[in-house]
Amino acid sequence: MSLQFNQRSLGKSSIKITPIGLGAWQFSEGKNFNNLIWKSIDSETTNEIISQAVKAGINWIDTAEYYGKGASERGVSRGLQAANLGDNDVKIATKWWPLLRFAKNIPKSISKRIKALSPYSIDLYQIHQPFSFSSVEKQMKNMVKIANLNLIKSIGVSNFTL
């Protein structure tokens, strides 16, 4: 069954997303650091969840570098490929994990995110939370540089506001 969602603009970007997205924390194939809270799931189940979410009308998936050390992002890519979905069919949001890291690490991290999610584009790249060895201002400056290189479509923050 497909629900009819009115799509909304993602922040100030031209990207349109449904009001409900699919969270991909569990798509980490046993590499999830936090199995005490909930268990990660296998590839077959991940593929089915992604397929059913898109059939239901959801057009974006939220994942992060920190979810299974990139395994969630790879699972999202495989699930989208298994469902024969193209880059424009689903929007992808992922996040940089800044804890105990410096803003100068962002370019290296985005290269890994791009590889993990290939062949799909990153529609939204976010700072996952505000705690870092670098100020949020320095982190955002690096995010803007990456956006200006057209490696990602938009930038933002998660779990805090600017």
Predicted regions and their residues:
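N-terminal binding-site loop/beta-alpha segment at the start of enzyme catalytic domains
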Residues: 1-90
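Short strand-loop junctions, especially beta-strand C-caps/beta-turns
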Residues: 64-66, 95-97, 130
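Short, solvent-exposed loop/turn segments at secondary-structure junctions
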Residues: 26-27, 97-99
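Structural preference for beta-strand elements that scaffold enzyme active sites
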Residues: 17-21, 59-60, 89-95, 121-126, ...
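Glycine/proline-rich, positively charged
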Residues: 33, 38, 100-162
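Residue-level signal for alpha-helical context at structural boundaries
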Residues: 79-82, 94, 143, 161
